[in-house]
Amino acid sequence: MSETAASGLRLFTSESVTEGHPDKICDAISDTILDALLSVDPHARVAVETVTTTGLVHVVGEVRTSGYVEIPKLVRDKLIEIGFNSSEVGFDGRTCGVSVSIGEQSQEIGAGVDQSHEVRSGENTDADDQAGAGDQGLMFGYATNETATLMPLPIDLAHRLARRLTQVRKTSVVSHLRPDGKTQVTLAYDESGRPVRLDTVVVSTQHDPDVTQEWLFAQIKEHVVDWVLRDSGLESTLDISGYSLLVNPSGSFVVGGPMGDAGLTGRKIIVDTYGGMARHGGGAFSGKDPSKVDRSGAYAMRWVAKNIVAAGLADRAEVQVAYAIGRAKPVGLYVETFGTAKFGLTDEQIQDAVLHVFDLRPAAIIRELDLLRPIYAGTAAYGHFGRDDLKLPWENTDRAEQLRDVLSLG
């Protein structure tokens, strides 16, 4: 690190976790239940939290729906899909306890969403004023041109490593692996804020008891880390020589999943978003239907930020939106480009263009992004943004030209 500081470089780190991490198990269960409910009732109101510990899954929350889903079966099927299918790995979806404690959504909250403050005060102007935000809060979105997906490179690489770690386990490319795991990537950034060197990669993976750490290191390096670095094509833009690789630096990792640590929905919000490169409003995503602006507002902000960068208006963009519970119109919007704006544009000019091009009322977001669909379970692990393996509507850059037109950039 001292050599890095002396060279004027700064280190930035992001982490990811696999779908077998206890918190991610809970996110996956919550979003699987959400998707199932949206499949039978697209207008279902859902707020589902999951807790897991040794031998037990507990599902709690509030739901308003005209449909029915068999939650215990959804829980068990998801656990087995992840890989917790035997007591030998520390958790068995077929035999674990599953308890469900779900009540009805508060009528007061429901009323504020169904009939906004604008409607109740006579301020409404069109149908999109009808629905109020499901809660107060602030949400951030971010984009940067340092990767093809317009995501920060540290979290992008960390997710790719975590996905590959799961892939080699499920396809038996590497034997003796178990579902729980984490990845971490440290990159050196130069004075202009560009990533220039891979500094450290950490991979921690649950494994069977009869493997040596030397064997595991070789397998992870060849089939996970080296594979991802080749697949990413970073050699031409990033110095990947001489990086430090740490595999299970704490030693043996046999006990994992819910047997190793209790899990809870919504505890990996930095993994879910930008790996710490951008600010976060604090609200989690999983288990929440899109009337909850914690989710839909954050997705809209990624959509906005990505279009700003895709339009060439800035190299980096962070946007914030804020809502009041029961109000349709946002109470605030903020755009920050960190001095990277192009064409002599100010952040205020870009902000005005965003307000002209994007309708950020919850009903409009839900309609424009078509969010009343079962599209959420796939986002529960490996990030909600920058996913080139999923077709997520908030990743579209369909408003980039409109932003340029509003700013008379042609």
Curated annotation (Swiss-Prot):
GO terms for cellular component: cytoplasm. It comes from the Bacteria. The keyword Kinase does not apply. Keywords: ATP-binding, Cytoplasm, Magnesium, Metal-binding, Nucleotide-binding, One-carbon metabolism, Potassium, Transferase. It is found in: Cytoplasm. The keyword Nucleotide-binding applies. Residues 107-133 are annotated as: Disordered. Its EC number is 2.5.1.6. One of its GO terms (biological process) is S-adenosylmethionine biosynthetic process. It catalyses: L-methionine + ATP + H2O = S-adenosyl-L-methionine + phosphate + diphosphate. L-methionine binds at E62, Q105, D261, K292. K(+) binds at E49. It is an enzyme of class 2 (transferase). Catalyzes the formation of S-adenosylmethionine (AdoMet) from methionine and ATP. The overall synthetic reaction is composed of two sequential steps, AdoMet formation and the subsequent tripolyphosphate hydrolysis which occurs prior to release of AdoMet from the enzyme. Homotetramer; dimer of dimers. This is S-adenosylmethionine synthase. The gene is metK.
